[in-house]
Amino acid sequence: MGRLFVKICGITRQDQAEAIAALGVSALGFIAVPNTPRYLPLSEMARWVGSLPGPVEKVGVFLDQDPRAIAAWVETVGLTAVQLHGQESPQDCQQLGEWLPGIRRIKALRVRQPQDLEVANLYRDCVEMLLLDAYHPQQAGGTGRTLNWPELARLSRERALPLPWLLAGGLNPDNVLQALSHLQPSGIDLSSGVERRPGDKDIDKVRHLLQQLGSQGWEIAPTLPPITPSATG
């Protein structure tokens, strides 16, 4: 089928991070947003995230935080990518690229209506990847809500996305193949779909996810797309 980038987000425990990385996923996501169920404080993140073995990408997830604070987290922890999950402007993303050369940027778009995809073009020159997530009025992510995959497929045909993109929103080992039958994302992002409870990952569910993908010939991509000149200013 091709290559697929697989990110497991909302990691809170070192033992689970190491076990999931050993299964061969592309990336682990760590939530740097206080007062959220999967928040991992800077002191804890700095203690072990940067030293995780292997080529796995280490993605910090931020929500409307000051670019200077984000840069400090990246440098302190040793993150290899940042995911911006709020209302960050293209200017914020561009500034992060100038401060953090070599760090990939993922801009999340919460899709509620067709117009939500139109803003994707605003970010084409200041991030390396987009993430499409289901809209929730109280939560920015990890809600368990799925997108309308057939409708998203139609919209993405009409409004071709300008960058590689990740599909998020309610994915789990039992529905991921159905989602991929409708869509052709560059990768997938799972959180609640591979958990026992928020922040407590179920390693068997992650293993089952990878087995499901492998059964249909998907190969797991080792890294995010390379940084291109157009995304560095």
From Swiss-Prot:
Keywords: Amino-acid biosynthesis, Aromatic amino acid biosynthesis, Isomerase, Tryptophan biosynthesis. It holds the Pfam family PRAI. It is an enzyme of class 5 (isomerase). Its EC number is 5.3.1.24. It catalyses: N-(5-phospho-beta-D-ribosyl)anthranilate = 1-(2-carboxyphenylamino)-1-deoxy-D-ribulose 5-phosphate. GO terms for molecular function: phosphoribosylanthranilate isomerase activity. It comes from the Bacteria. GO terms for biological process: L-tryptophan biosynthetic process. Pathway: Amino-acid biosynthesis; L-tryptophan biosynthesis; L-tryptophan from chorismate: step 3/5. Belongs to the TrpF family. This is N-(5'-phosphoribosyl)anthranilate isomerase.
